Amino acid sequence: MSKEEDNKAIVGRWFTEFWGETCNLGVVDALAAPDMLLQYSLHAPRRGRQDIKAFMTGFREAFPDLKFWGAADLIAEGDYVVGRWEGGGTHTGPAFSDFLMGTLPAATGRKMRFTGTTVLRIDNGKIAEEVGLDDGVTALSQLGLIPAAATA
């Protein structure tokens, strides 16, 4: 396989096992570089395997049905892989204070569903960076953390 195909296989496994319907935290040790950067607009940046595992553990405790899935084929060029996705979940778990725009009290029952595009950089077979551009405004509005846009 080419470098790009190898990198797409790594990212495909990451999306399925880390962001999919169930989370296998062991995939962090298998695929993430020791100092991997995970950065999305809704949350503070995470650095390193332990920080990334702690983030996902808290996210899935607050949103037990959390899952994301690919919305298009992965695109690869050199060390980079780009994926378009959608997903979300229902806040039925404990209070969640990881959003940059506020805290959810325990079990609000609010649902979020949103989309995004993620760029991942692969270095020597490990994910060095995952930087996502997401529709965080939609998610925060659905969760009641910011006002919904007025409709005409």
Give the predicted meaning of each segment:
Residues 1-152:
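C-terminal and inter-domain tail/linker signature
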